[in-house]
Amino acid sequence: MNSNWYKLVMKASKVRFGKNLLLKGCPFIYNKKGAELTIGNNVTVKSSFLSNLVGLYSRTIIVTRAPGAYIRIGDNVGMSGVTIYARKGIEIGENTAIGGNTKILDNDFHPIEAETRNKLLMDKNGGDSDLIPAKPIKIGKNCFIGCNAIILKGTELGDGCVVGAGAVVSGKFEPDSVIVGNPARCIRKTGES
């Protein structure tokens, strides 16, 4: 797909983007009415398995799912085959690299409790409801997120954090933390050996 044509589609759904947005492949970028989706300058979105040889399993998906939700992607951010899905809000700081197949999800997609889940199944809005637990995510500047990481609701990564491949991240982490594992934990600071 021609990226200039796709940029017109993005503008139609009120996606705001800066200069030099590079789209490789065919991402799915959608902004729900009443939400905010902003992409900074010099952002690269890879959405084709040939665009990143780490092995992309799906195309990039960037979606605001509820009125009032926001996704704010800073300048000079790169991503490959990433899913960014917001019901509340997700901020990604400038100069951040997001590895292949990473998921950044500010919600649980469904309640844990069976009774609440059953209410959601009967929801007249097709499950698009405030019954779904959600908390904003904030990723600082100059972060690196390794491939196949999952960033869960309520996570806050300080500037300069490094997230290891396959980590499942939840919680608040100080700047320059090296974060690995499932559940993810800080094993050291970036300047330490």
What are these regions (language model features)?
Residues 163:
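Binuclear metal-ion centers of metallo-dependent hydrolases, dominated by the metallo-beta-lactamase
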Residues 155:
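Extracellular carbohydrate recognition
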Residues 1-112, 123, 132-142, 149-151, ...:
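Domain-scale signature associated with acetyltransferase and cell-envelope carbohydrate enzymes
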Residues 167:
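Glycine-rich GHKL/ HATPase_c ATP-binding element in histidine kinases
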Residues 117-128:
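Short glycine/proline- and charge-enriched loop/turn segments
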